[in-house]
């Protein structure tokens, strides 16, 4: 799995992606990271990558010609790469989308800055626009890291226990509550069913709690599980 990241702040990477499970997988060669400095494709001595928007308005936009040269260089080396632009205007990034992206094998993530990028870049190169949520952050780098982390976890060999992926939130509803030692802490005890060692009862309890939590917090997710959106259980 190859991720090409186009950014004006290449030193931000790998950042958090260099730690824990995803970082170990990077060092083992289970996925690779190719960070491309957009400024290196600027044509002036100041390495200018932005300009004022036509029609006026606040802020600056990243220039189409500079971005175009940067993207072309990546496409020359990786002609089959999937182009993704992290943008608050994009479609909401989900676990299902993460699964789909992994199948491409080679992904190029364009990280916007300032007020965004010249729209012609999205149109000419047919970028898939992806948003990590209904909020605005300073740039696309953190969003790109979220996308990469989510995708890398599903690469074969990255997560040792495959059941961990199958039981996570959003696979089909939200994840059930989990507990570890001590059995009692600050007057709160672990549910008895988890202490009895009956695997069937444990699974039934987990399914029930997953359903209850999903109904209360994210009923929209139940549509993908063949459930109803309305109603919640207080049992």
From Swiss-Prot:
GO MF term list: tRNA (guanine(37)-N1)-methyltransferase activity
Enzyme kind, highest EC tier: transferase
Keyword match Nucleotide-binding: no
Keyword terms: Cytoplasm, Methyltransferase, S-adenosyl-L-methionine, Transferase, tRNA processing
E.C. designation(s): 2.1.1.228
GO biological process: tRNA N1-guanine methylation
GO terms for cellular component: cytosol
Annotated positions binding S-adenosyl-L-methionine: 112, 132-137
Entry-linked InterPro entries: Alpha/beta_knot_MTases, tRNA_m1G_MeTrfase_C_sf, tRNA_m1G_MeTrfase_TrmD, tRNA_m1G_MTases_N, tRNA_MeTrfase_TRMD/TRM10
Subcellular location: Cytoplasm
Keyword Coiled coil: no
Reactions catalysed, as given in the entry: guanosine(37) in tRNA + S-adenosyl-L-methionine = N(1)-methylguanosine(37) in tRNA + S-adenosyl-L-homocysteine + H(+)
Record note on quaternary structure: Homodimer.
Family indicated by similarity: Belongs to the RNA methyltransferase TrmD family.
Role this protein plays: Specifically methylates guanosine-37 in various tRNAs.
Protein name: tRNA (guanine-N(1)-)-methyltransferase
Organism field: Anaplasma marginale (strain St. Maries)
Record gene name: trmD
């Amino acid at each position: 799995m190859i991720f090409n990241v186009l950014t004006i702040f290449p030193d931000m990477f790998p950042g958090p992606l260099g730690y824990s499970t995803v970082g170990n997988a990077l060092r083992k060669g289970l996925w690779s990271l190719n960070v491309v400095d957009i400024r290196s494709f600027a044509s002036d001595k100041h390495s200018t990558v932005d300009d004022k928007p036509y029609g006026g308005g606040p802020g600056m936009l990243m220039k189409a010609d500079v971005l175009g040269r940067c993207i072309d260089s990546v496409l020359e080396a990786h002609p089959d790469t999937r182009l993704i632009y992290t943008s608050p205007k994009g479609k909401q990034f989900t676990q299902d989308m993460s699964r789909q992206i992994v199948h491409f094998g080679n992904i190029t993530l364009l990280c916007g800055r300032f007020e965004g990028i010249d729209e012609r870049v999205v149109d000419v190169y047919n970028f898939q626009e992806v948003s990590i949520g209904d909020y605005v952050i300073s740039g696309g780098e953190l969003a790109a890291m979220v996308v990469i982390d989510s995708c890398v976890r599903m690469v074969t060999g990255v997560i040792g226990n495959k059941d961990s992926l199958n039981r996570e939130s959003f696979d089909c509803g939200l994840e059930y509550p989990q507990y570890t030692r001590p059995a009692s802490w600050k007057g709160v005890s672990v549910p008895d069913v988890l202490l009895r060692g009956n695997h069937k009862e444990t699974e039934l309890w987990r399914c029930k709690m997953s359903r209850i939590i999903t109904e209360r917090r994210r009923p929209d997710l139940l549509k993908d599980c063949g459930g109803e959106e309305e109603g919640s259980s207080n049992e």
